[in-house]
Every structure is written in structure tokens, then in C-alpha cells.
């Protein structure tokens, strides 16, 4: 595997030898000193050019300059995921030695959005000054409205998890659990970290550093919210998710002076228990579904 120094040398060599490329920046985790360094870090690079057209959808240029990637994605040329259509062209590349470059070929303009960024090359000496704001990565203190909305979204979406299990709709139940419900859980845990660390740390994208900042017992509980595909396992994870969220939310609410809607939590807990125990269907209706649902939780 090529070293980071070798990769940086390659990137700068390509830029220096091409007069159309006027500046180069490095972003992402490699520009952030607070991110732990490892072999999986991407090289998030931007080439600033006057005209993007010659670089647009041109994998032959990529192969000539960087070598043929083992895997290549060109988001701006895809239909499945609508592109941003902002004038930039991205090449996302993984090479045979495992190195990854996310290359953005962009028109000559730069707006400092506060994310860590390093200027690697400025041929004209006119590149705007980059004022790195490290706290851009810190967990942000929520407003009372944002906190309440997170709680409501979390509690509401749990009902879909329960329905999906009861209906034997595994993909749907998993999607609800691991998208809207988990998104809100991770957000609340990030605020919990913020409270404990005075909002001066970053839990990372998707909460990837939560293990570092959460109390160990709470992190163990978080692990228990991930289930297998058996419905019994899913029910246990769903209730653990409910209780973990509630404990974290109470901590955040107390620290920031927000009210926490205990009745809302109680309401979804009672509903989940009704569904789990098969007590919603009128007598004589849905008995077979109820029986199967109970068997799958045993």
C-alpha cells in the first residue's frame, strides 16, 4: 500500500503538470488534526480549474493520471442518485492497493464553510484565506424546539417498527428501526455527549466516536439496540432503544433546562406492548397473525 506521503506526491504531481489546475485543497479527516489517523482515511481533494468541461465524465484522464481504479463512482453521471448539478464533477476512486481518493474538480471559486481544509497548492497566489473553525465539528447545543422535535420523531417512528414486526414485514421493520428511529437515538446520544463534555468534542459522523465519549454502561446499552433478524431479538432491541433514549433525553433535558414529555414516552411504550402481546386485534380477527407474532418473540 502506498504511503500517505506517496499519495500526496502523486496528487500534487498531477496538479503541477496540468496548467488547467490552478489550486489544490485537502479536506475531510486528513485535514482535521482531531481525527485519528489510520489506513482507511480518504484523500478528499479538490482541483480548482477555470473550465470543468475537459474533466467532465472523463475516466480515461483518471486512468492516465492516477492509474486504473479497482472501483470508480461518478455521482454527477448517475441517474439512480440525482446529482447536485452545481458545476462540480466528482471521481470517487478506490485503487488496487486500498488507497481511496475522492476528487472534486470544481470551478475556480471557494467558500469557507468552516470545515477543516488545507491549501496544498496555489499557482496564482490568489486563493482565499482559509479560516479553519474547529468547532464546526463539535456537537451543537440543541434549542428546546429541536430537542422536542427529536423526541417526538423518535417516539412516533417506533410505532412503525412495532407494526412492521406484527405484520411480519421484516425489511420494513428493520428500515424503520435503523433509519428514522436510530437517527434520532444517535442524535440524542450526541447531545448527551455534548452535555458531558461541554459541547467541546465531536462524536463523529453517524456517531462513530460515541464509544470514546459515552459512559461505558451507556455504550453497552447502545450495542444492545442492534438486533438480529429474529423478531424476539428485534422486540428486545426496540424496547432497549426506547429506554436508552429516554434516559439520555432526561439527562439532556435536565442539563439544558428543557421539558421532557414523559407521557409521550409512556404512550409509545404502552402501544408497543399492546402490539407485542397481540392485544390489538378484535376477538376472532387476526388470530393467526397474533399467534405467529407471539411465536416469533419466544
PLM regions: where:
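Metal-dependent nucleotidyltransferase catalytic core
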Residues: 1-19, 27-38, 46-103
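Conserved NTP/Mg2+-binding pocket subregion across the NTase superfamily
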Residues: 6, 66-178, 278-281, 298
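Short, solvent-exposed loop/turn segments at secondary-structure junctions
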Residues: 31-32, 52, 108-110, 195-196
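Short aromatic-enriched loop/helix-cap "lid" or pocket-rim segments at secondary-structure transitions
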Residues: 36-39, 115-116, 203
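Generic secondary-structure boundary/loop-capping signal
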Residues: 63, 115-118, 207, 219
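Conserved nucleotidyltransferase catalytic core and NTase-mimicking acidic/glycine-rich helix/loop elements
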Residues: 138-286, 290, 294, 298
